[in-house]
Amino acid sequence: LLGIFCAGRFDSRVTGVDADENVLPYMELHADVNNVKIAGEKRTFQQLSVDYLSQFDVVVGADICFWDEMAGMLFNLTHRAVKAGVKQIMIADPCRPPFSDLSERCQKRYGDNAEVEAMWLSRPVRASGEILIVKP
């Protein structure tokens, strides 16, 4: 959904990626409902190579760090994205422990080039979370 928002709001060229091929038709449906075009691909985090990532300027993810082992996978993905020349990596999460681990690891590795922004919403529902932003 984040990529669909970016396609609509910023007129971005978006490739949506999910490890579960059953998600792709829903992604296409959401894109159609929002009158945007996106490409969809079935890939795991590990399949996003330096070569593959080199075609993107920005990598975004939301609500993708929910299992303990995902912190390591996303840390490695962030490192590959940096090596690929991606200009900005942003990952949003409601602050689950694996995300906090990922954020700490990125801040240690990338120093001032990694920051965490806290966000709060009061409408349409009360919610809070953080966004990890890495700008190599």
Where are these regions (language model features)?
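S-adenosylmethionine-dependent methyltransferases
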Residues: 1-136
